[in-house]
Amino acid sequence: MALVQRQHSYLLRYFRLMASRPRPRLFSHSLYPSLHRHSSALSSSTPRIKFQLANVFSQRLVQRNAVSPKSFMSSTMESLQESSTSKDYSSEHIQVLEGLDPVRKRPGMYIGSTGSRGLHHLVYEILDNAIDEAQAGFASKIDVVLHSDDSVSISDNGRGIPTDLHPATGKSSLETVLTVLHAGGKFGGKSSGYSVSGGLHGVGLSVVNALSEALEVIVRRDGMEFQQKYSRGKPVTTLTCHVLPPESRGTQGTCIRFWPDKEVFTTAIQFDHNTIAGRIRELAFLNPKVTISLKKEDDDPERDVYSEYFYAGGLTEYVSWLNTDKKPLHDVLGFRKEINGSTVDVSLQWCSDAYSDTMLGYANSIRTIDGGTHIEGVKASLTRTLNSLAKKLKVIKEKDISLSGEHVREGLTCIVSVKVPNPEFEGQTKTRLGNPEVRKIVDQSVQEYLTEYLELHPDVLESIISKSLNAYKAALAAKRARELVRSKSVLKSSSLPGKLADCSSTDPAESEIFIVEGDSAGGSAKQGRDRRFQAILPLRGKILNIERKDEAAMYKNEEIQNLILGLGLGVKGEDFNKENLRYHKIIILTDADVDGAHIRTLLLTFFFRYQRALFDAGCIYVGVPPLFKVERGKQAHYCYDDAALKKITASFPGNASYNIQRFKGLGEMMPAQLWETTMNPDTRILKQLVVDDAAETNMVFSSLMGARVDVRKELIKSAATRMNLENLDI
């Protein structure tokens, strides 16, 4: 997209932004002759498009469709009116959902959402099943293919799903796990097929089946190949089998191919290669004995992309990879320990040029994005053990100094992976581990390892404590500014920034704030907004790059203070509470030039480092102003990219006379134009950002916004070959 390439697209590698716009769907035949699509109902001409804010690097911040307040209120009132028409309430109104109907009725309960994240969750469910086979020692190779018809196939060389008759259902075991909720081999106990697995509820495969237009499965085991096809959770063919040829009789495993259902998902059915590659890379680090391949097919076979992931070093190599662009204080520390049937695997490293921590937790190879008892165990052990060792070995001389968890974790990259026979996850999407015994096991293991290692390597302890003491001193220097932020109530207008043009609504859920670049754009935005629910905060130039500054410098910066106070962000490090925000929509609105792209990136860096939970809560948005205005007679057309401009001009007669205006700054637009094209909830394009892969996003911010010029230069050089020089705004 031309808009992107004019805005230093290398600064926004991991921002994938999508919005519905027309474009034709592309389909092609499968490379697997045994997996054909027979039903014409599986194809669709539904117009969809994917907008990308950057196409230079793999993306890690993903967009979700935004619903305008007016649209929300309209649909809500319609629902209320419909429900109020029936005053009777009897047994006729009680619905009994059977089979996989609950999944199709409430898909969000099983996959988190019906947007992009839920779409990719389907892939992860099948991929995690293959990983469970690998963790059990039965699979060593997993292949993932993103087909050009928007389907996905995942195959492994594990044992293969059983196909014999199941005594409880009277169906084959294969059909049972595909069509019956809570049917699987991972419930633990003597009858379980796995000692350790990421599956708990026996719903993963059946959920994918329920939410797919079509699903095809091939199982190879016992010298036979079994095949069956499904549509929206129901079998459309019987289970067929044939004897494998002699040269293939030793092969075994499972291959699942599915086409997500367009009736279920609210976004375009389009899998992001980089998102899935990030998850596969993660799994390869966590399972060092497994090779995972990823292939992205194209209509033109010469443009197919193939990658293979294998990391013999495991978590130690993972930490090194994450810290590639940083200055480590010591070699990567790590250990693996088994206690009472559970396995604890931890790797960690401190870096001198990092001012925040990166802590990633996994349970049975499932990424627990909301942490859990394993992360709590590491944090508690680190704080207690480092304080104890520092005082014991007299690295800390003052008796009164006690380093907090924030101090000892500054600059830390830590990965903890646990394998637990009976994991207790919160919800089907498994975002948090709840086993209380895991905290004790992890805490004890980390303490024993660090105590032994650091007593033998006092120089490493000294470097870590020195880094922690610097964090402690910086925290003291920032205390006055922090207390100022804490003492100023976000509800008092007297404490708000002077340039903030607030909205009249006091309900954060319906309020939104536009962070705009400069007084010129701020003036147009203030005049063009809807004062009832839209606030405007103009910035004075570029804000501080907090990636290169400590906490003290950050709190002293006036523009940063304005953001913290104006938005109600609270104090860094404190638990995030969305209800404390003054606005639940924070919209970044900058000019379509290099400076605008830079300011947007600085703001994203600030939000990611200061309060990362803003992305998880769905509060961060990017506004999209038009690039062009095309006037022909009394008609005016606004175009948001070069493709739209070409489409409009191509629709005019050859001898037509028209004028094209290129907008580079928001200040060039009249208030009415800005409202209609960029701020009106009914007509604007608003793109929501969420963190899809925290580890890679963290690494990119470190590379692009950190102090190391050589790393940034190398990153830019590696992207140069993929940029269209004609679209650069020089």
UniProtKB/Swiss-Prot annotation:
Molecular functions per Gene Ontology: ATP binding; DNA binding; DNA topoisomerase type II (double strand cut, ATP-hydrolyzing) activity; metal ion binding
Catalysed transformations (reactions): ATP-dependent breakage, passage and rejoining of double-stranded DNA
Record-listed E.C. numbers: 5.6.2.2
GO CC, alphabetical: chloroplast; chromosome
Annotated compartments: Plastid, Chloroplast
Site positions for Interaction with DNA: 542, 545
Transit peptide: 1-34
Gene3D superfamilies per the UniProt record, alphabetical: 3.30.230.10, 3.40.50.670, Histidine kinase-like ATPase, C-terminal domain
Major location category of this protein: plastid
Cofactor(s) recorded in Swiss-Prot or TrEMBL: Mg(2+); Mn(2+); Ca(2+)
Cofactor note: Binds two Mg(2+) per subunit. The magnesium ions form salt bridges with both the protein and the DNA. Can also accept other divalent metal cations, such as Mn(2+) or Ca(2+).
Chain residues that bind Mg(2+) 2: 591, 593
Domain Toprim: 511-618
This protein's record includes keyword Transcription regulation: no
Residues noted as binding Mg(2+) 1 in the record, renumbered to the chain: 517, 591
Single GO biological process annotation from the record: DNA topological change
Alphabetized CDD domains for the sequence: HATPase_GyrB-like, TopoII_Trans_DNA_gyrase, TOPRIM_TopoIIA_GyrB
Record keywords: ATP-binding, Chloroplast, DNA-binding, Isomerase, Magnesium, Metal-binding, Nucleotide-binding, Plastid, Topoisomerase, Transit peptide
Pfam family, one: DNA_gyraseB
Complex formation: Made up of two chains. The A chain is responsible for DNA breakage and rejoining; the B chain catalyzes ATP hydrolysis.
Family of this protein: Belongs to the type II topoisomerase GyrB family.
Chain's role: A type II topoisomerase that negatively supercoils closed circular double-stranded DNA in an ATP-dependent manner.
Protein's name according to its UniProt entry: DNA gyrase subunit B, chloroplastic
Organism: Arabidopsis thaliana
Gene name of this polypeptide: GYRBC
